[in-house]
Amino acid sequence: MGTKIKTHKGTKKRFRLSAKGKAMHRQSGTSHLAKGLSKKRRRNLRGTTAVAECMEPTIHAALNGHSY
């Protein structure tokens, strides 16, 4: 009987799975020094966006407690 592999907590805080199973994350560039960006750019950085397809298996594995 082996031990379970734990969920990676850093990944859990940064990523969420959508209803269809896609990994979603917040966009970068809004924490500070955003005043220099146009309002349109700041508005478009709001919300979440899907992760690149090549990273999906790694993120799913980290969230579901599997080794990768």
Curated annotation (Swiss-Prot):
Query: Which GO terms label this protein's molecular function in UniProt?
Result: structural constituent of ribosome
Q: Which InterPro entries match?
A: Ribosomal_bL35, Ribosomal_bL35-like, Ribosomal_bL35_sf
Q: Where are the compositionally biased (Basic residues) regions?
A: 1-25
Q: Which GO terms describe its biological process?
A: translation
Which domain of life does this protein belong to? Bacteria
For the keyword Transcription, the answer is no
Pfam families attached here? Ribosomal_L35p
Give the start-end ranges of region Disordered: 1-43
Q: Which residues form the signal peptide?
A: none
Cellular component GO terms held in the UniProt record: cytosolic large ribosomal subunit
Keyword entries, A-Z: Ribonucleoprotein, Ribosomal protein
**Secreted as UniProt keyword:** no
| The family this protein is said to belong to | Belongs to the bacterial ribosomal protein bL35 family.
- Please give the PANTHER family that the UniProt record associates with this protein: 54S RIBOSOMAL PROTEIN BL35M, LARGE RIBOSOMAL SUBUNIT PROTEIN BL35M
HAMAP family the record matches:
Ribosomal_bL35
Listed name of the protein:
Large ribosomal subunit protein bL35
The organism of origin for this protein? Rhodopirellula baltica (strain DSM 10527 / NCIMB 13988 / SH1)
Q: Quote the gene name from the UniProt entry.
A: rpmI
